[in-house]
Amino acid sequence: MNTLIGYKKCSTCKNIEKLLEEKNISYDYREIDKDLLSVDELKKIKDLAEIDIFKLFNTSGIRYRELGLKDKKKDMTEEEIYDLLSSDGMLVKRPILLTKDKVFVGPQVKKYLESL
C-alpha cells in the first residue's frame, strides 16, 4: 500500500491527491502535522529517496523562517537535524510518497506520478 504524507491545507499535497486519484492509485494519507515522523522514519526516507538531509527541510515554510534555519542548519549535527524535524512536522518537506520499494519527496512525487 502506498502512503502519502502531507498537510491537508497544502495546495501541492491536494494536487498530488488528485493525481493519485486520477491514476487510480490507492493510498493511505498521513497528516504530517498530527502524526509526526520519527527519527528512524526520517532516516529511512532520506536513504530511500537518496537525498541530502537538507532536502528534508520545508524551506518555504513559516516555521523554517521563524527559526532562522537557513543559516542555523549548516552548524547543526545530523542528529540535531533529525531531532528537530521529528519534533515539528511543519519543518518537513512535503508531500512524501512511500511506495512498496521507493520514496519520493517534494517535487519528486509529481515527476514520479506523471511518469506512470
Where are these regions (language model features)?
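Local sequence-structure signature of Cys/Sec-based thiol-disulfide redox active-site neighborhoods
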Residues: 1-19, 23, 28-32
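Alpha-helix C-terminal capping segments
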Residues: 20, 115-116
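Thiol/selenol-based redox catalytic cores and closely related redox-interacting motifs
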Residues: 34-115
